[in-house]
């Protein structure tokens, strides 16, 4: 079996490659990323290509499955650049899958694709995927879900799987996630237990997470199995302010959502940090997901708990952990994080 993976050098992509490499049914893997990494894995060959611009049909020819992970979080101050890769690039991937006659497509959707929903009960995959209007990320995830709806109608012979995970963490993603969401001004020591005196106990601030290795196992099962459709991917427990405070050895302090959003908005507009306020809206609005279908139809079961994945991420952020790929490499930040400052904090991708 030959598998092509776009966005293969990031947090999720590297774990997906490792999971596919271990599967005897997979003979060869083509990893596609904007920049060729130093990482070497058995069965894996690399091609440097941008899904928003490169000719993809030739790269997909002969593949038994394409796993589409490529996605931009930054530059958050360049909306058109995000849309060009996230929506335009996805459309080009789907078109190339059809033209190359690839029989299976596995797409990395997200909890962010869902319309606002409940936090006191879990919803299944039938919940509407209208996204969160104020979130760039959610807008694009919802738009790509619509593209995929059209693709499935026009290409019924292609087996399509959509995975909708919560937040995905691992040790090696520590530096990447710190760069993407906290920026160069936040010291690593701030992620140590006891460093923060309090965490915001904001109403509806409850989220789900999964370890990258467990998410990767879901992708592997989707590739080598016969299932199709959408699948929620998340581990237990749901992370709420009380649990988050316990993990950080901090006190939960009630903070209104409006104050949290205002802080994010002002600091983002001043380019003090790279996360726009839409991420706060997304965190407060998206529903809690029921992952029973993935367990039932994919045979997926997470090995690690959500809080264990979060603690591993915090360790990676504290230690500056990474891996030998451009998105994960701590050295990419440069001395004193100079390369991050040169992006104007959300002005362009690193």
Label for each model-derived stretch:
Residues 1-22:
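N-terminal Rossmann NAD(P)H-binding glycine-rich loop of SDR-like oxidoreductase domains
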Residues 151-207:
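NAD(P)-dependent short-chain dehydrogenase/reductase
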Residues 215-277, 291, 311-312, 320, ...:
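Mid/C-terminal beta-alpha module of Rossmann-like enzyme folds, strongest
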Residues 92-137:
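Conserved Rossmann-fold NAD(P)-dependent oxidoreductase catalytic core, especially the SDR/UDP-sugar
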């Amino acid at each position: 079996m030959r598998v092509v993976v776009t966005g293969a050098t990031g947090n999720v992509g590297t774990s997906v490659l490792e999971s596919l490499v271990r599967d005897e049914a997979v003979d060869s893997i083509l990893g596609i990323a904007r920049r060729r990494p130093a990482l070497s894995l058995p069965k894996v060959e690399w091609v440097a290509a941008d899904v928003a611009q490169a000719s993809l049909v030739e790269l997909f020819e002969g593949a038994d499955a394409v796993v589409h992970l490529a996605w931009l979080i930054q530059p958050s101050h360049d909306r058109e650049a995000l849309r060009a890769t996230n929506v335009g690039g996805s459309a080009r991937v789907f078109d190339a899958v059809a033209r190359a006659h690839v029989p299976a497509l596995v797409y990395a959707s997200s909890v962010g694709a869902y319309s606002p929903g409940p936090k006191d009960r879990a919803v299944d995959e039938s919940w509407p995927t209208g996204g969160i209007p104020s979130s760039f990320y959610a807008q694009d995830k919802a738009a790509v879900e619509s593209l995929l709806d059209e693709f499935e109608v026009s290409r019924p012979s292609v087996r399509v799987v959509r995975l909708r995970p919560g937040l995905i963490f691992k040790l090696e993603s520590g530096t990447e996630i710190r760069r993407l969401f906290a920026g160069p001004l936040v010291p690593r020591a701030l992620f140590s237990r006891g460093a923060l005196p309090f965490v915001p106990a904001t109403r509806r601030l409850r989220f789900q997470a999964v370890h990258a290795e467990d998410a990767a196992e879901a992708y592997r099962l989707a590739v080598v199995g016969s299932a199709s459709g959408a699948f929620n991917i998340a581990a237990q427990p749901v992370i709420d302010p009380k649990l988050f405070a316990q993990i950080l050895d901090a006190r939960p302090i009630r903070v209104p959502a409006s104050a949290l959003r205002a802080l994010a908005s002002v600091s983002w507009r001043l380019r003090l940090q790279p996360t726009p306020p839409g991420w706060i809206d997304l965190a407060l609005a998206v529903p809690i997901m029921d992952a029973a279908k993935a367990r039932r139809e994919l045979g997926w079961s997470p090995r690690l708990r959500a809080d264990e994945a979060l603690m591993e991420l915090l360790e990676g952020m504290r230690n500056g952990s990474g891996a030998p790929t451009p998105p994960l490499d701590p050295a990419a930040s440069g001395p004193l994080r100079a390369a991050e400052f040169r992006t104007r904090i959300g002005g362009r991708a690193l």
